[in-house]
Amino acid sequence: GQVMLLPKDPSTPVIMVATGTGIAPMRAYIRRFFVEDIPSWNFTGLAWLFMGVANSDATLYDDEFQECVKRFPGQFRVDYALSREQNNKKGGKMYIQDKVEEYKDQVFDLLDGGARMYFCGLKGMMPGILSMLEGVCKEKGINYDEWLEGLKSNGQWHVEVY
């Protein structure tokens, strides 16, 4: 649906957060940005994928993503949260919200600059994501409810979970 449409401005940074089969639309975005030749839409922004899976054997399309990292080093990055192989800063399992939190300053700077953030995958990731973002807002002295509402009203917040 319209919830997951890409920005019209091809210079807009895009932060993608996916778990499991939620990688499907993110892969389509990445292919649109870096593989398909679309003269009318030449992506010039940053595309940053956070992918949460149980272990490295479950990193779908990693070969494609690593090729994009090599071909577009300043424009594409991918970070994995491997819950059965990595630990978070508290020593627990590394979930998607923990991986995003590792880069909280960069993520917040990008969002402050107009980046779009897309979430797709298991609905169980969203409570952890929202709780983490609320904690980061508190650390930064930001009113969380106003901040999140601002992202939504500015068209920067896109969620498709199931």
Task: Show which residues each predicted segment covers.
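Active-site beta-strand/loop microenvironment that shapes enzyme catalytic pockets
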Residues: 9-35, 125
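Reductase modules of NAD(P)H-dependent flavoproteins
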Residues: 1-5, 34-162
